[in-house]
UniProtKB/Swiss-Prot annotation:
It comes from Heliobacterium modesticaldum (strain ATCC 51547 / Ice1). InterPro entries: ATP-cone_dom, NrdR-like_N, RNR_NrdR-like. Residues 49-139 form the ATP-cone domain. One of its GO terms (biological process) is negative regulation of DNA-templated transcription. Binds 1 zinc ion. Belongs to the NrdR family. Keywords: ATP-binding, DNA-binding, Metal-binding, Nucleotide-binding, Repressor, Transcription, Transcription regulation, Zinc, Zinc-finger. This is Transcriptional repressor NrdR. A zinc finger (unnamed) spans 3-34. Its cofactor is Zn(2+). Coiled coil: none annotated. PANTHER family: TRANSCRIPTIONAL REPRESSOR NRDR.
Length: 152
């Protein structure tokens, strides 16, 4: 590994650790020329997921877009940010295990809603109202009735 300080091509590994749930290897190195220490990260190069939108267009999967939608749905709700980040990570992992490359946007929305329903029902209804594009109160009430039936 080339030294980031002097550019020398040889370094020795002082320490190796697993990070990010085993998806990253962190190595502490020392340059054989200038003796300065630096850190490198080694991670799997994942194939990017492509989302097929309802209208047929394609766009790159963006976990920040999912998190943003969840944050709006969970506004003023007692849900920690790390819980939402964990939810997005779980959904992304499940998508990667079920799809090679192209994912229907419908599947992403359904996965998020199924998990959000178990975390916070108010946030779930907010998310569902946007995702399912409720156009009238009747459709909204149907969703609420479905939630109430699950509780009994």
């Amino acid at each position: 590994m080339r030294c980031c300080y002097c550019g020398h091509g040889e370094s020795k590994v002082l320490e190796t650790r697993s990070a990010e749930e085993g998806r990253v290897i962190r190595r502490r190195r020392e340059c054989m020329e200038c003796n300065r220490r630096f850190t490198t990260l080694e991670r799997i190069e994942e194939t990017p997921l492509i989302v097929r939108k309802k209208g047929g267009s394609l766009e790159a999967f963006d976990r920040n877009k999912l998190l943003s939608g969840l944050l709006k749905a969970c506004e003023k709700r007692p849900i920690p940010l790390d819980r939402l980040e964990e939810l997005v990570t779980t959904v992304e992992r499940d998508l990667r295990s079920q799809y090679d490359r192209e994912v229907p946007s419908r599947e992403i929305g359904e996965m998020l809603m199924a998990r959000l329903r178990n975390i916070d029902e108010v946030a779930y209804v907010r998310f569902a109202s946007v995702y399912r594009q409720f156009t009238d109160v009747g459709r909204f009430l149907e969703e609420l009735e479905g939630l109430l039936k699950r509780k009994t």
